[in-house]
Regions:
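C-terminal, loop-rich substrate-recognition/catalytic regions characterized by aromatic stacking residues
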Residues: 1-288
Length: 288
């Protein structure tokens, strides 16, 4: 495709590329969830040529987090927040993602979200979901496939004991267990981070009022993934993803100059007044 484009516009070859549809995307998913001949997860995928981006007919659907750890389209009920402690001295290690540099310590792409010596800072082989500073919210097993294609935003309602801290969000495709993956395979799809002081503007930092519930909009990288039957859609919330993103010491000091760190007590709210949710761009399953 790219060679045809350059042939047309650099060499003047009339090959009809200017009549192609303007958007080409690869939708991940649809594989067997078993190991392929190279020992890698067969996640599958297919190419699509489309007329516009985001896709016409996209249904932007809020999936709400709930106190019981579930994720779904129903509105949350009154509940106490879910809390965790963020310790900058023990950050959540980066496990794949859309990285393009430092591949010796941050392998890019999709990985099972569990400890591995390939990842910088991993000290065990436990699932990242076992960490006390990672909140996990997931759907029940899907009864029909769900295609997510387009921009993704997490609206987070949270409070912190710190005047500045970070919050992270990660969208995960949870594959069901099988003979190759007895514990299933929790594959990262997209993620991002927000620094509290820049929640409203990168030009005008604004510190937090400790303990005050605050709205954060975390914009994840756009993606295209087909969550298959039997899979689960999962959202992880935490406060670090290192070394992909630098560690926030929680002090509110000048960036990169603070030699001290402090713990941050984080509270994620999920009630009718503070409905933390991820907006997923759902595509009708009859798209060709």
């Amino acid at each position: 495709y790219r060679l045809r484009w350059f042939d047309r516009w650099l060499k003047g070859i009339d090959n009809g590329v200017d009549g192609d549809k303007p958007v080409r995307l690869f939708t991940m998913g649809g594989g067997t969830s078993r190991k392929d001949r190279n020992g890698k997860l067969d996640h599958g995928g297919s190419w699509h040529d489309i007329d516009d981006w985001p896709l016409p007919g996209t249904q932007y659907t809020p999936y709400h987090v709930h106190a019981d750890g579930s994720l779904g389209v129903t509105q949350p009920e009154p509940s106490q927040p879910t809390c965790y402690t963020y310790d900058p001295r023990d950050p959540v290690p980066t496990m794949g993602g859309g990285v393009s540099a430092a591949n010796d310590i941050m392998p890019p792409g999709g990985f099972d979200q569990r400890g591995d010596t390939r990842f910088y800072g991993c000290h065990d082989t436990l699932p990242v979901a076992a960490r006390s500073d990672v909140l996990v919210f997931q759907t029940t097993e899907l009864q029909e496939p769900v295609e997510v294609t387009g921009p993704i935003t997490v609206r987070l309602w949270a409070a912190s004991s710190a005047i500045d801290t970070d919050f992270t969000a990660k969208l995960i495709d949870v594959h069901p267990a099988n003979a190759d993956y007895p514990d299933g395979f929790s594959q990262n799809i997209s993620d991002s981070i927000i620094r509290a002081r820049y929640r409203n503007s990168r030009d005008t930092p604004q510190m937090l009022t400790p303990g005050q519930i605050t709205q954060f909009d975390i914009v994840l990288y756009p993606t295209s993934n087909l969550f298959g039957v039997g899979h689960r859609i999962r959202l992880d919330i935490s406060s670090s993803n290192f070394p992909r993103f630098d560690i926030n010491p929680n002090t509110g000091g000048a960036l990169g100059q603070d030699r001290r760190v402090q713990l941050a007590e984080q509270a994620v709210h999920h009630d009718p007044e503070h409905p933390t949710h991820v907006v997923l761009p759902i595509i009708p399953t009859d798209r060709q």
